């Protein structure tokens, strides 16, 4: 059970008192939260949003929401002044005014009662703290994957979202791609027969550091709130590589690596098509190597296998080691392989199947952002709900733990912990730098 997040900031500006000052001069947009009954949203009202984390992915997502006529973006937040001012300009230019607020501290944005929903696209080590605080503040959430950098962080997000009755869409947008859904529907409706193996491949060693300067302490550049950037992670001397992409993906303090970050995309599809992966106990084995260049230290390459009592196996490797990019379901009647480039099957006739009306259908979203906005209005779960994000995230994280400990582990999904293994269970959480805590 998640405790109240360590937010303070006068407890999100003490509600209304701080909100008066923060909302002066805002555009005349009635928040959807003030309309409708029992949490419902009128079809003509706009969903008022704020974006937290304005790097590449945050900008991409914000542009998608700007393109939705049922949304009004009123605030952006980033610890880098140049980024937040650029984001403010993007929003203001879109609406033709100067009304977008730009914040350094996400707590100031969350304290506004006119905001219905938030985008979270920060570095991974911030996801849990901000998502939990957002749910507690009554906001719906579009959260980039993964659900934190530790299993218990994802659990805290899940529990808090449900306790406060919020909508959360995980940024696993492959669920809004018809070919991924079709592959999963073939598996779920037993067109492949009994599934005996799932193969997942995700990027890993192909990503290299882009910040080429020496790994030495550098002056903190003007306009960067470095203390806020570090947040709950251990404080380390500033080096530009700590903010560069994909460099921060490769640093343990801010991310669990591609095994648990990018891997979430295809692990999510694996679990969507074969839900037993997160329902039954599994033995988890993983071997691999870690980066070690004085700055980056995350897992570089890996070969993991999860074994289930009924004979099902899932192998999860970095791309080409040996699994191909994507997700492959293998059954007694054939196989289907899907990734962002396409879908393949053996026999090929599987691809001509039409899922019958009385069979399992996995939704019809073709726009991940629009699906989220529709869920905010209807209060129904989106296509990638919080539970799905948590499960896909922890599959990668438990493989990383097995690799780090260099031994086989036994995972109990009902308890959400390893069996009779205190050392492994300690790694389900990460310590947070004071004053931050979950």
Model region roles, listed by residue range:
Residues 2-143, 152-167:
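N-terminal glycine-/serine-/threonine-rich beta1-alpha1-beta2 phosphate-ribose binding loop
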Residues 14-43, 374-438:
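C-terminal helix-rich "cap/oligomerization" subdomain common to oxidoreductases
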Residues 53, 190-209, 221, 225-236, ...:
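NAD(P)-dependent dehydrogenases' Rossmann-like dinucleotide-binding region
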Residues 140, 148-225:
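A contiguous active-site-proximal alpha/beta segment in oxidoreductase catalytic domains
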Residues 170-172, 216, 253-260, 288-293, ...:
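Active-site rim elements
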Residues 294, 298, 302, 307-366:
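NAD(P)-dinucleotide binding in Rossmann-like oxidoreductases
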């Amino acid at each position: 059970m998640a405790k109240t997040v360590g937010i303070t900031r006068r407890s999100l500006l003490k509600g209304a008192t701080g909100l008066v000052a923060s909302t002066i001069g805002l555009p005349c947009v009635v928040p959807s939260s003030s309309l409708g009954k029992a949490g419902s949203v009128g079809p003509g009202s706009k969903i008022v949003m704020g974006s937290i984390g304005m790097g590449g992915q945050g900008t991409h997502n914000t542009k998608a929401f700007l393109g939705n006529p049922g949304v009004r973006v009123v605030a952006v937040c980033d610890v880098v002044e140049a980024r937040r001012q650029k984001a403010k300009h993007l929003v203001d230019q879109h609406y033709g005014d100067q009304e977008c607020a730009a914040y350094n501290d996400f707590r100031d944005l969350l304290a506004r009662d006119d905001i219905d929903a938030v985008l979270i696209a920060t570095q991974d080590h911030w996801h849990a703290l901000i998502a939990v605080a957002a749910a507690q503040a009554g906001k719906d959430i579009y959260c980039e994957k993964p659900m934190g950098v530790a299993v218990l962080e994802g659990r805290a997000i899940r529990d808090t979202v449900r306790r406060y009755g919020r909508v959360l869409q995980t940024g696993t947008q492959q669920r809004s791609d018809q070919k991924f859904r079709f592959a999963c529907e073939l598996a779920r409706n037993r067109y492949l027969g009994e599934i005996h193996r799932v193969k997942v491949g995700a990027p890993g060693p192909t990503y290299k550091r882009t910040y080429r300067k020496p790994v030495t302490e550098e002056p903190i550049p003007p306009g960067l709130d470095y203390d806020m950037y570090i947040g709950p992670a251990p404080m380390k001397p500033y080096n530009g590589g700590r903010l560069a992409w994909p460099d921060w993906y490769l640093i343990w303090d801010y991310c669990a690596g591609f095994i648990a970050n990018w891997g979430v995309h295809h692990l999510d599809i694996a679990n969507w098509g074969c839900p037993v992966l997160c329902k039954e106990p599994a033995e988890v084995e993983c071997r691999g190597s870690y980066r070690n260049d004085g700055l980056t230290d995350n897992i570089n390459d890996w070969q993991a296998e999860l074994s289930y009592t009924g004979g099902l196996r899932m192998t999860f490797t970095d791309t080409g080691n040996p699994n191909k990019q994507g997700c492959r379901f293998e059954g007694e009647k054939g196989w289907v392989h899907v990734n962002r480039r396409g879908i393949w099957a053996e026999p090929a006739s599987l691809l001509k199947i039409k899922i019958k009306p009385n069979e399992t259908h996995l939704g019809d979203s073709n726009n991940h952002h629009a699906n989220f906005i529709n869920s905010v209005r209807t209060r129904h779960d989106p296509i990638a709900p919080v539970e799905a994000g948590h499960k896909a995230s922890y599959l990668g994280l438990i493989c990383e733990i097995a690799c780090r400990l260099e031994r086989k582990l036994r995972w109990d999904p009902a308890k959400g912990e390893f069996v009779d293994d205190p050392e492994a269970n300690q790694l389900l959480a990460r310590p947070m730098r004071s004053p931050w805590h979950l």
